[in-house]
């Protein structure tokens, strides 16, 4: 891991800032971001997760946090902590059912506040759960926070892969390294026959990684317990450390730690 502290217009001290991105919604990006963060914490790193998905914040629910952040003597918000991970999300500041009906400039101001107006302290890794797509928020964060790299999350379907490619191209244009691509919902293991079923096709993300010369980080299967734990606010990689899926996350986290 690099020892250099990253500082930027969005002022935060972190040795590595990694964006978790997807070209479209519904591919499990936030689920990956949360479990990736707690896995890095389990490996001994100091971790923060910033929920940059202003319009659809998921981190509060997935991390099991319902409290509101307080302000310290420096007039900065103190991140909320669960499972040893520092967390900040617009979802902590508005009611869960209240939509953020904001235009671009207000979104940018909110994102800057979550960087500069939060007492993050020094971190080994800040994980940013980006909103889906390739719009203003993604570009601003990529250009203003000096990202160490990004991880692209996709499902095997062709339409998801097409949008993932757009994300790869965006990061290439703003000179942010793509550290790898993950194929989520890659397959399903039947509880009865124990056979592997590739419901949404399989292997597309790996083919795209080879085409773009990007590391393929791994395949994560569909698992009902993963969904249940997310809804309960208990990240799967905390509650089921010895599960096969947790081992996949550990493998991915170690690959990223070796690169950064």
Where are these regions (language model features)?
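Phosphate-binding loop that captures ATP/GTP phosphates
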Residues: 46-97, 108
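Phosphate-binding/switch loop-helix module in NTP-utilizing enzymes
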Residues: 94-141
């Amino acid at each position: 891991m690099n020892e250099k502290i990253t500082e930027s217009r969005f002022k935060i001290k972190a040795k590595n800032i990694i964006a978790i991105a997807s070209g479209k919604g519904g591919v499990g990006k936030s689920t990956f971001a949360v479990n990736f963060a707690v896995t890095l914490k389990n490996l001994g790193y100091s971790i923060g997760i910033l929920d940059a998905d202003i319009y659809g914040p998921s981190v509060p629910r997935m991390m099991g946090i319902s409290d509101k952040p307080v302000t310290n003597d420096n007039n900065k918000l103190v991140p909320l902590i669960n499972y040893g991970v520092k967390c900040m999300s617009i979802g902590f500041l508005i009611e869960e059912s209240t939509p953020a009906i904001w235009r671009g400039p207000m979104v940018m101001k909110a994102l800057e506040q979550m960087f500069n107006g939060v007492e993050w302290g020094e971190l080994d890794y800040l994980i940013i759960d980006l909103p889906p797509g390739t719009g203003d928020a993604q570009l601003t964060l990529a250009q203003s926070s000096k990202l160490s790299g990004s991880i692209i999350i996709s499902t095997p379907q062709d339409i998801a892969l097409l949008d993932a490619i757009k994300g790869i191209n965006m990061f290439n244009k703003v000179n942010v390294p793509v550290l790898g691509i993950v194929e989520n919902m890659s397959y399903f293991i039947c509880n009865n026959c124990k056979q592997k079923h590739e419901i949404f096709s399989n292997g597309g993300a790996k083919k795209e990684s080879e085409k773009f010369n990007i590391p393929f980080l791994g395949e994560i299967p569909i698992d009902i317990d993963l969904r249940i734990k997310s809804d309960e606010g208990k990240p799967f990689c905390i509650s089921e450390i010895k599960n096969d899926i947790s081992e996949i996350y550990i493998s991915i986290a170690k690959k990223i730690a070796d690169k950064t």
